[in-house]
């Protein structure tokens, strides 16, 4: 059930349901201005757990960030900070609604965990179009995020959601085969390690065996606590998937590498000299 609170100048909808085309319910947190109105939306959709505090999931990175860039702490309590997504305390005062969605099988959203899959991309499309129809939305949906939350922007943009207005892609690979899994045709172990270390610990169904949210004391990975066997049935084996699809022409990769010619919305893309090279060259 959605809980609504008024905190830090924002109206916040916690764990709001979004129904997918197959009937599955995803869960979203919505940060909006307190004043009733129709606002542009900044959306993220992904696997890292919308209730997982930056300081709990990535403490070394947090400590480095606040040491090197103390201005991050200015004008924000930082208690809504999550990994690689926008801080609503910086965007909502400027007249935006920030929507964070736990992807299928991750965090508070049930279902089968399969990152970057066509099903996940379709869900993202559905979320964009859902947000455009809400009473607090002006129908213009922007996407903004880093890494995972950037990669899946390329993917969903290929589907051309009618209400997708613009994207801010920060360090987001486009070609998951060449830029992520098989560097120069040689298998890279990063993807499997990332899935094991960053996705599975946020899988829905961990319940009391997972993280607790600082913001409310509830469980980051849902109220239910499933057995290890049940959790295994509810997720893909990404390392196996990538190793068994060795060629870029395999259907697995073709379903995950978007066609740039079908992406028509304005894009701001930035990255360091690595990873996202294809998107710059195109």
Annotate each predicted stretch with a short phrase.
Residues 135-148:
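Alpha/beta-hydrolase fold nucleophile elbow
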Residues 82-83, 93, 115-135:
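Alpha/beta-hydrolase active-site loop
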Residues 263, 269-271:
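Short beta-strand/loop motif that positions the catalytic acidic residue
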Residues 275-281:
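Conserved alpha/beta-hydrolase "acid-adjacent" motif
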Residues 51-55, 59-77, 81-88, 93, ...:
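Accessory cap/linker subdomain of secreted extracellular hydrolases
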Residues 88, 92-108:
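Conserved alpha/beta-hydrolase
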């Amino acid at each position: 059930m959605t809980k609504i609170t008024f905190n830090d100048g924002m109206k916040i909808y916690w764990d709001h349901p979004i129904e997918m085309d197959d009937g599955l319910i995803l869960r979203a947190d919505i940060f909006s201005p307190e004043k009733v109105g129709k606002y542009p939306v900044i959306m993220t959709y992904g696997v890292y757990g919308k209730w997982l505090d930056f300081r709990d999931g990535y403490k070394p990175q947090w400590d480095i960030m606040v040491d090197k860039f103390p201005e991050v702490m200015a004008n924000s309590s930082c208690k809504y900070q999550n990994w690689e997504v926008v801080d609503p305390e910086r965007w909502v005062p400027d007249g935006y609604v920030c929507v964070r969605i736990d992807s299928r099988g991750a965090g508070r959203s049930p279902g089968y965990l399969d990152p970057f899959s066509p099903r996940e991309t379709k869900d993202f499309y559905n979320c964009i179009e859902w947000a455009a129809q809400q009473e607090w939305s002006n129908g213009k949906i922007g996407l903004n995020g880093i890494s995972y939350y950037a990669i899946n922007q390329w993917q969903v943009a290929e589907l051309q959601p009618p209400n997708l207005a613009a994207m801010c892609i920060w360090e987001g690979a486009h070609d998951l085969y060449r830029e992520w899994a098989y560097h120069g045709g040689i298998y890279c172990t990063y993807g499997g390690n990332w899935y094991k270390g960053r996705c599975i610990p946020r899988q829905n169904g961990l319940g009391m065996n997972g993280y607790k949210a600082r913001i409310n004391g509830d469980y980051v990975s849902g109220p239910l606590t499933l057995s290890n066997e049940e959790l295994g049935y509810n997720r893909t084996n990404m390392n196996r998937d990538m190793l068994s699809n060795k060629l870029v022409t395999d259907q697995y990769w073709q379903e995950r590498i978007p066609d740039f010619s079908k992406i028509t919305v304005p894009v701001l893309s930035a990255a360091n000299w690595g990873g996202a090279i294809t998107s710059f060259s195109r």
